[in-house]
């Protein structure tokens, strides 16, 4: 018997070291990407977050009245990490790399909190590697490089971990307080977290209570039975978290909206059933799981097969979890119910309202494949364990291959704004105009040297109150200025055409041209407006 125990302990140590190596390799590859290749794929949204963090570092606050935010206010968000780093480093790239490391470590800490709460094998080391692996273009752009969704997903892991601990019994006050506090803080930024976390979690808890309740002759008795089930212990904390989230959103809409500049979500209204938007939801779900366009006879087919398998696994296994009262721990069943409730919530939101939508909005739902996969490995029977381990290893290998192709593409990519930004700095330009898609990128690439007034697509230089300092709409650029016309933008490939704006530029003012942009130089803002026939600065 001692020998068998020794062999078992040795096998566990070996497995632990393999999983630790897996997570370390995945993390190391991501750090190499940040250090060496991230500037190659820097985009306007990523750069805008850095501009905000730099502004907050100068002002010494966590929010700013001198910034035009986008769809939500940044409260419990990435600027809490990035802004202090600007007081330590002058290189914006260094700030981005160090800040990314810190944020990913916080992301993993939230995951391990959930893993320990749910008693996953090795606290979820396999999942830790998957979380830092770019399994799809959207996840790479908006989580691992852009970092935007790290707060949303990390908060979900923390609150889910608290919920699982409540269902395990023992101390319940501290986890319940954590659910309430994180729900309130997250909702201060806007209503997004309610749809990502609070509403699905409440529905999931209620669903499990209903399914686990003994049969009854009346609805009232059934509800009473549901309340007395083991899952009933979670109902009060989830409802309290809902109340806290609503209170946070109320502060956002009624108090913070009066002081800060961000898009109001009050426009969202119910509509009739929109089949086109439901079709979009299905396609967005595919994309958020890593589906990509490409030739059938290529690696894209393998990656898309993995994405489809993950979607099928998440839905089927979640149903098994919800229905498996006798087989699965209640906390694990909660995760399955949470995934199903989240999918239904998003489908209803986009199918029955006019809410704004983007493929990336489903990333917090798609990433639940990681805890579901870990739960499957933790709960599978000895009979099915070899098959489960083998299929998981195959999936991990495919996703690692997918990540390798992504990193290879990043290594050979070039940022189209790099040459233009260097030219402007070398020739003494500091202030000027560009589209949103170019301007903030140029600022980050030059460590804040270029100060760019970003424009909305129009036939005249109309400033856009979106992800730039408010002073840009009050005062014009100073000294000699530049005006960037992106060729792809002039051709209307991403935004409504600005060909009229391009046509207004006098050719004798052209100072730089490459395959992506034309740049025009003027002695002053007033000189530019006179030469182009534009009205005076507002």
Where are these regions (language model features)?
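Membrane-interface micro-motifs in multi-pass membrane enzymes
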Residues: 71, 75, 120-167, 189, ...
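Membrane-interface alpha helices of multi-pass inner-membrane proteins
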Residues: 174-200, 243
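Hydrophobic/aromatic-rich transmembrane helices and adjacent perimembrane loops
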Residues: 147-155, 301-311, 333-383
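Juxtamembrane segments of multi-pass membrane glycosylation machinery
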Residues: 61-63, 80-102, 107, 119
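Short periplasmic/luminal acceptor-recognition loop of GT-C membrane glycosyltransferases, typified by
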Residues: 427-462
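Membrane-proximal lumenal/periplasmic loop motifs of glycosylation machinery
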Residues: 35-44, 57-83, 93-94
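Signature aromatic-anchored transmembrane alpha helix within multi-pass, membrane-resident enzymes
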Residues: 15-24, 174-181, 239, 306-313, ...
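Transmembrane-helix motifs of polytopic, lipid-linked glycan transferases
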Residues: 98-122, 158-161, 313-317
């Amino acid at each position: 018997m001692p020998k068998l125990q020794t062999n078992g302990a040795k096998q566990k140590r070996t497995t632990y070291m393999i999983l630790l190596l897996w997570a370390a390799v995945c993390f190391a590859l991501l750090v190499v990407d940040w250090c060496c290749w991230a500037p190659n794929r820097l985009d306007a949204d990523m750069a805008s977050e850095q501009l905000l963090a730099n502004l907050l570092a100068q002002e010494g606050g966590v929010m700013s009245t001198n910034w035009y935010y986008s769809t939500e206010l940044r409260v419990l968000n990435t600027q809490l990490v990035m802004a202090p780093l600007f007081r330590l480093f002058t290189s914006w790239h260094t700030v981005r790399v160090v800040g990314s490391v810190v944020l990913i470590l916080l992301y993993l800490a939230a995951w391990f909190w959930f893993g320990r709460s749910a008693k996953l094998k090795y606290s979820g080391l396999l999942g830790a590697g998957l979380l830092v692996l770019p399994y799809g273009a959207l996840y790479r752009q908006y989580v691992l490089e852009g970092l935007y969704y790290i707060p949303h997903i990390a908060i979900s892991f923390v609150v889910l971990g608290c919920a699982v601990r409540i269902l395990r019994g023992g101390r319940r006050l501290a986890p319940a307080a954590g659910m309430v506090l994180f729900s309130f803080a997250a909702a201060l930024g806007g209503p997004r977290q309610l749809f990502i976390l609070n509403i699905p979690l409440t529905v999931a808890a209620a669903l499990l209570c209903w399914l686990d309740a003994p049969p009854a002759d009346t609805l009232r008795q059934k509800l009473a039975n549901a309340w007395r089930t083991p899952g009933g212990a979670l109902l009060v904390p989830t409802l309290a978290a809902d109340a806290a989230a609503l209170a946070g959103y109320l502060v956002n809409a009624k108090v913070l909206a009066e002081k800060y500049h961000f898009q109001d979500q009050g426009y969202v209204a119910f509509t009739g059933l929109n089949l086109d938007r439901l079709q979009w939801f299905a396609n967005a779900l595919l994309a958020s799981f890593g589906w990509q366009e490409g030739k059938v006879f290529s690696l894209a087919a393998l990656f898309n097969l993995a994405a489809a398998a993950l979607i099928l696994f998440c839905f089927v296994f979640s149903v098994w979890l919800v229905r498996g009262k006798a087989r699965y721990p209640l906390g694990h069943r909660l995760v399955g119910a949470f995934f199903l409730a989240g999918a239904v919530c998003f489908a209803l939101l986009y199918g029955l309202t006019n809410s704004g939508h983007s493929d990336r909005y489903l990333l917090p739902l798609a990433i639940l494949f990681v805890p579901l996969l870990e739960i499957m490995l933790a709960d599978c029977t000895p009979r099915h364990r070899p098959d489960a381990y083998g299929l998981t290893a195959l999936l991990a290998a495919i996703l690692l291959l997918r990540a390798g192709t992504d990193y290879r593409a990043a290594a050979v990519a070039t940022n189209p704004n790099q040459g233009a930004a260097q030219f402007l700095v070398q020739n003494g330009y500091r202030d000027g105009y560009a589209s949103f898609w170019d301007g903030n990128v140029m600022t980050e690439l030059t460590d804040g040297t270029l100060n760019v007034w970003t424009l909305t697509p129009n036939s005249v230089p109309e400033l856009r109150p979106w992800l730039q300092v408010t002073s840009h709409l009050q005062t014009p650029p100073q000294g000699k200025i530049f005006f960037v016309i992106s060729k792809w933008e002039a051709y209307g490939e991403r935004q409504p055409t600005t060909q009229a704006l391009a046509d207004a530029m006098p050719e004798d003012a052209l100072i730089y041209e490459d395959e992506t942009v034309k740049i025009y130089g003027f002695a002053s803002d007033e000189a530019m407006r006179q030469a182009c026939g534009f009205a005076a600065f507002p």
